[in-house]
């Protein structure tokens, strides 16, 4: 075989005289690394480069034994930041993912030179070319440097567009003015809060427009006005097989709630970066487990109950899978575990409620106390068991009777009654349904209840239930 051809050297190195000191490799600017090629990915992806920056955020691996952090740090081009230029096209910030690197983690404010491979991290399964990713550097070496001018946070007065956020990726930013918590659905699981600029929450599309294309367009507008405040942890705090649940939440505590509608003010800069397919505000240090590091203050009060006319009080209450039939009695049924690794709720079973009698007693006690405290005359219930649909019983009202009995036992007398199921029910129902309960001394049902069946509800929602009521005008007569 022919001998292998010797690799050619770059022109600068090939012309170098023997014994001559070689020049240090040229530094590549962070903005050059962030310059996209095809799509949003860096044009230098998979190449090894060397760059210089100021450390603006640090997330050391193993900082907290109970929480998995981001395991890296963020750098920004020295002397950059300050006034936001909405027309800028590339970012001056970059995430450095330490991973298995044995290099020492620098501290916030350090000036460093990092040599490593350019990578794109999506953080979601089944990522496609359109999935938002994070440009990052996987380091081979990290060297202390000098002559780094400090960086300034870029002030933001709202949620930038996607292209603008791409040009601010991994940069230090300071959101200005007041923001509002518009969703906290993911707070208990991932420690995040969904924020929108201003003082008002965003409304669900179908509260404003009709379902369909108009609602889809409205939700897209809402998404463009929303960004999550993260906690720099990737731990699922509800996974009790891990130990994240033992740590304090970043933005939530007893006596200090983070309710939808509460206002948020940023007191410290954060990093704008892409995580799990979307942009987020990331604190410069892990705040999960360390709430004193929070970059925000949260203020708000629950609005007072409005004064309204009328003498009949109607309420709605989601009993969250109230099942008097228990998972422990269903063959093969497993459960979701609590922090003590005991089954509490059914998992992938015909039933969906409490797994054990103790878990059911805990659930029932809370629901009974809440409904009796609300003190409504009529309560529409959601997510109460339908034993017929699950095949457990022929008594469609079995769980409903159980709840009413518990309410009356707590009240000390026969205060509550339930509206019986109508004689005609849909052939295809879910194992949870809707129901009505009412106070017998205040109101009475008129005729039978009616379930409005339609194929549109099958597999998507519970069929609506309607019941006419009339108030009882005195102790002995209905009027």
For each feature predicted by the language model, list its residue ranges.
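Extended non-catalytic accessory segments flanking core domains
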Residues: 19-345, 363-365, 443, 452-463
